[in-house]
Amino acid sequence: MSLRFAVSNEIELKPLARNISRSISNNQIILFEGEAGSGKTTLIRYILSEISKSEKKTFSFQGSPTYQREHIYNFNKFNIIHFDFYQVQNNKLDLDEYFYDYCIFIEWPLENLIKRYNHMALSISISVTGKKRNIEIK
């Protein structure tokens, strides 16, 4: 089953981000796919912001971890590790060591990670059509 949404601006992402933020926990993997500039990082920022609001906690988004490869966000209910594998060539990456302690967000997931974790991951694909973002969640 998949859900599809079309948004015309960032503000329209907030309700979607709120719903996603309410459904995540440790031991979960979320794959964010889409071309550069499609809004993957923006959606992640909104999801993290919604978690922060629900916990009444100060939050500072660290941006996309393109060059550091990962950022960790500690919340009361769970922790999130945000990976960005843009331009990463190592297909031998393994997430098992993170799975039990984090909810794992992955931008630009590598093919081997998609194959290995797809059965247990939430996949969010964003495509661009004109000024609209088409979001598919499955």
Language model region names:
Residues 35:
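P-loop (Walker A) phosphate-binding loop of NTP-binding proteins
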